[in-house]
């Protein structure tokens, strides 16, 4: 189902997830179109990039797809993909694009390693953007989502809310909202394919008009 109230998004935000494959890129595509924002994935591992997919399904112009800071070939955790290529992912090397509206997508979940000392949550904290968490709707999501929220709060990250992706599960959404003390912004279903023709309408359906 969609969201009963329009969501007020900040001009720049970070999209993370409870796991890999939970729908971060899908949500990022909706936001990039709906908010007329630039998309940036600082660390990409895997030959097929999320930016390429996002361009195909949204039709975003090239100037709104910011180049990755680290583009790694192997579809592995960033620290391992970088190790195999002899690359060191360095904290402090990530400069936010100079644009008014920005959607930043993380790799994997918040505890994914970037190098021998740093995790994805270190990058989230360094960039200091409000965070939107994408979670699955299925069994196991309550635990994964609450742990993710806990880690973000321990680092004093500002949490916008949670987007739940998958078959409708009102009980899990209620539990996430209650125990996580967080707003579930929307329930979405990425089984609905995105295209340049429908992405804006799906953003309106799930999130309403942005103030």
Segments and roles (model prediction):
Residues 7-10, 149-211:
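C-terminal lobe/tail of nucleotide-utilizing enzymes
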Residues 9-12, 26-88, 93-96, 100:
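N-terminal phosphate/diphosphate-binding loop that engages ATP/GTP or pyrophosphate donors
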Residues 115-138:
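Inter-motif core of Ras-like GTPase G domains
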Residues 22-23:
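Conserved glycine(s) of the Walker
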Residues 58, 127, 179-182:
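Short, structured coil segments at secondary-structure junctions
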Residues 94-115:
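Switch II (G3) loop of P-loop NTPases
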Residues 1-15:
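Extreme N-terminal, non-catalytic leader segments
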Residues 40-43, 132-135, 160-166:
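Short internal beta-strands
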């Amino acid at each position: 189902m969609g969201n009963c109230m329009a969501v007020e998004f900040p001009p720049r935000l970070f999209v993370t997830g409870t796991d890999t494959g939970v729908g971060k890129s899908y949500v990022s595509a909706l936001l990039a179109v709906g908010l007329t924002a630039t998309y940036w994935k600082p660390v990409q591992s895997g030959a097929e990039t999320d930016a390429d997919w996002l361009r195909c399904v949204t039709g975003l112009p090239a100037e709104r797809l910011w180049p990755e800071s680290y583009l790694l070939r192997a579809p592995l955790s960033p620290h391992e993909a970088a190790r195999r290529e002899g690359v060191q992912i360095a904290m402090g090397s990530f400069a936010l694009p100079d644009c008014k509206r920005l959607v930043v997508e993380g790799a994997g979940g918040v505890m994914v390693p970037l190098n021998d000392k740093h995790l994805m949550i270190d990058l989230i904290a360094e960039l200091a953007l409000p965070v939107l968490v994408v979670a699955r709707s299925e069994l196991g999501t309550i635990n994964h989502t609450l742990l993710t929220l806990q880690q973000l709060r321990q680092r004093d990250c500002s949490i916008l809310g949670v987007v739940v992706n998958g078959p409708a599960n009102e009980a899990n959404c209620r539990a996430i909202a209650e125990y996580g003390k967080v707003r579930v912004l929307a329930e979405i279903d990425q089984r609905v394919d995105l295209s340049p023709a429908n992405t804006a309408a799906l953003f309106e359906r799930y999130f309403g008009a942005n103030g």
